[in-house]
Amino acid sequence: MEEAAPCSEPAKTIKRIDRESVHRICSGQVVLSLGTAVKELVENSLDAGATNIDVRLKDHGAELIEVSDNGGGVEEENFEGLTLKHYTSKIQDFSDLIHVETFGFRGEALSSLCALSDVTISTCHKSAKVGTRLVFDHNGKITQKAPYPRQQGTTVSIQQLFHTLPVRHKEFQRNIKKEYAKMVQILQAYCIISKGVRINCTNQVGQGKKSPVVSTTGGPNLKENIGAVFGKKQLQSLIPFVQLPPNEAVCEEYGLKSTDLPEKLYSITGFISRCDHGVGRSTTDRQFFFINQRPCDPAKVVKLVNEVYHLYNKHQYPFIVLNICVDSECVDINVTPDKRQILLQEEKLLLAILKTSLIEMFGSDVNKLNVNQNLLDIVGNVKAPPGDAEKPWVEMSHHSETENPSSEGKRVMTLSRLRESFSLHQTESYFQSPKKVKQRHSSSKQLSLDTILSTVRTQKAVLSEDSESCHEMKSKMPVPRKYLRKVDDIDSGFCSTSESDAGYNTPEAGSCVISESVNNPIEEEFCSSEEQHQNEYLKTVGHSEKSLECDIQVLGTEHKLNRVNDCNNQTNLPQEATNSLPRVRRFKNEADDFKAGIHPKVENTRNYMPCVDVLVEVKKKTVPLEFSMKALAERVRKIVQQQQKCTETQNYRRFRAKISPGENKVAEDELRKEISKEMFAKMEIIGQFNLGFIIAKLNSDLFIIDQHATDEKYNFEMLQQHTVLQGQKLIAPQNLNLTAVNETVLIENLEIFRKNGFDFVINENAPVTQRVKLISLPTSKNWTFGPQDIDELIFMLSDCPGVMCRPSRVRQMFASRACRKSVMIGTALNVQEMKKLVTHMGEIEHPWNCPHGRPTMRHIASLDLIASE
């Protein structure tokens, strides 16, 4: 066996990374965002036993983050290890991790913050007479230490977060408002779960005044904290969570055996919004989950809660606060750097408890209706007593509970079962009365898809033999065009047609299809094809070479075309058509006569001039010209290669998705990849199909475009961009009870709210949650809007501040208007109107779907692939 050749470079030895580099690398993985930085500092204050925590931000946290508390403070002997990596007082070894009850235990937060920013800490322990101010370098070492007068507690100041990582710092500053909104969401969770702790957060932009972000009063329970953060109005829509053991059906769903379930493993408390429509929220911005009072993001729990809620209110999401208490030995919190992903031992049991409890809560007495009649049976018939046949089907009784609480004729049914009954009844009645579809005939100028596909398929294609006499073809009466019956193998480009599909009578066997390529030059040497005679004939009857809007009536309007018996035999055209044929035919006849030995006679000898060459002496200037046959051959070879390359590119199958609902996503991706906006203006309009679709051609690809869907999407986007909704003034200003952060978002995006028809009065001197009052609401005919649309708009602007956006109900209104004002299916369009619709597709952002989700455009065939086959 041969030895490997020695490497010219010396082998790189494995070495330990220096401590400073390790520190900077790992620190960037601990503190990931503004929210993480604030979270770590607030958790330190809570671990120190603080009852009063103040968070102060400058420029949304980009300039300064300062957290002050009245906790126990830091003893002087712990100053050195306060900001060193993996120095902590919470645990001593790994076994202590199982029983840890504090938020922090790794000793990484302050050390990482030192590596990413400039950290200053002032602290005063309860045993010290005076406080101390400490300044740290990026390695966590103390650079300055001085006495500092302050009360018991600790203040940590973070300046220029991420400035040691230039790329992240620039990205952080660019998205500071998004980071700020996420930070507030995290801080709200600690405000809710921290009982007896007053948390206050303010933000100062530039040299302006401080604006409150969130504030709590240190309430003794969850309910008071929720009211302090989100206002008393939010409390009115909440019901307490009532824990129930999982029933047999749910246990079977999760594969649990009721006999083997541990008892009292989980204790769940909290609140959730009622499932009545209008009580929930349009987004998931107010969902808080805690495990042992630690904020977390349990993905499966979140999914389950929303799914159960959607069974009763499918258009909204619940407000929910859930605290799940479980033995610390059954939990692993050391999973991710931010400790928000938590692993549980008996997770299926937790999900079963939650599902059973939520279903029972939403189906409880709060959401029951009293009805006088029996429920619908499964097929939608009413089961009523014999004597009640003439009574109303469902009779709501508002006084049933007070007037006759023990009535036997009344049944109690839940909202969910009532909705199910109604949906069954309505579904059945819907299918029993289908709508009648009105069919219309197209104008005589429109091309049928059969004509288009057959003319471009090949010049040797032959129509079916079944036909009627040419006498009917000569008729000047317009023939109604029928629709295509079937298109087979749309990917390969072949289609199956019949006489009924084509919409007109075809010639007998042997007749050839009129070629589309009438504007291509005809080769003189090969002109025996019947198609070329018909092309020349079409020219003589006055048809434009560029026009593709010829109907089959053309063949029978002014010049009569005799029946063709055999395509290989010479066609007997009328005399007027034969005379009008160019010199191609005459040349061919003379050649045949010459072969037969018949020479043409000279009719006029006086006009006959002999051809004699006469020598003429001309002075010529000779210019030498460089010529290389080799260079010419090389150039020809390159041109041939380039043409072959272009042909291969054209024959490449760029569109593979079928026209099927299951392949909509694939088809959209292909169109988005292959079609750019400027290509729509270059598309050639072939015609209209079925009074509802436009057939367009780009290079060698045929596309079918829904005329209604594409016009609807264009109108929708124009309404979205340019419509300013008119507002209706309120009689008296309405208090919105917004949170401090939502007030800030609204004030910063007032212009966007005004374009949506909302107007407010701002009182900067009013207390938090009372600064903004609504004075105008948008109204538009039958559409009305309210505070829930403001909440949705605030949520959207929290993620994309300053970007023009619309609430979902405004989008629905625009979609409805765009649909009504668009070109309808069944409307005949001329070429200019179709071209306008196709060109508009290149002027909008998302041309592939209408606002209601229908596709606007699909690829139907590639002509190159059809020709090659």
Curated annotation (Swiss-Prot):
Recorded catalytic activity of this chain's protein: ATP + H2O = ADP + phosphate + H(+)
GO CC terms of this entry: cytosol; MutLalpha complex; nucleoplasm
Compartment(s) of residence: Nucleus
A Pfam family matched in the record: MutL_C
GO biological process: mismatch repair; mitotic G2 DNA damage checkpoint signaling; positive regulation of B cell proliferation; positive regulation of isotype switching to IgA isotypes; positive regulation of isotype switching to IgG isotypes; somatic hypermutation of immunoglobulin genes; somatic recombination of immunoglobulin gene segments
Record EC number: 3.1.-.-
An MF annotation (GO) of this entry: ATP-dependent DNA damage sensor activity
Chain span(s) of sequence motif Nuclear localization signal: 585-588
SMART domains with a match to the protein in the record: DNA_mis_repair, MutL_C
UniProt keyword Hydrolase present: yes
Main location: nucleus
SUPFAM superfamilies assigned: ATPase domain of HSP90 chaperone/DNA topoisomerase II/histidine kinase, DNA mismatch repair protein MutL, Ribosomal protein S5 domain 2-like
Disulfide bonds: none
Keyword set, alphabetical order: ATP-binding, DNA damage, Endonuclease, Hydrolase, Nuclease, Nucleotide-binding, Nucleus
Primary enzyme class: hydrolase
Binding site for ATP: N44, D69, E108, A109, L110
Top-rank taxon, per record: Eukaryota
InterPro entries hit by this protein: DNA_mismatch_repair_CS, DNA_mismatch_S5_2-like, HATPase_C_sf, MutL/Mlh/PMS, MutL/Mlh/Pms-like, MutL_C, MutL_C_dimsub, MutL_C_regsub
Protein role: Component of the post-replicative DNA mismatch repair system (MMR). Involved in B cell growth by positively regulating B cell proliferation and controlling replication efficiency. Controls cell cycle to prevent re-replication and defects in DNA damage-induced G2 checkpoint. Doesn't seem to counteract or control the immunoglobulin gene conversion (Ig GC) and to contribute to guanine/uracil mismatch repair. Possesses an ATPase activity, but in the absence of gross structural changes, ATP hydrolysis may not be necessary for proficient mismatch repair.
Family (UniProt): Belongs to the DNA mismatch repair MutL/HexB family.
Stored PANTHER family: DNA MISMATCH REPAIR PROTEIN MLH, PMS, MUTL, MISMATCH REPAIR ENDONUCLEASE PMS2
Stored NCBIfam families: mutl (TIGR00585)
Protein name in the entry: Mismatch repair endonuclease PMS2
Native species: Gallus gallus (Chicken)
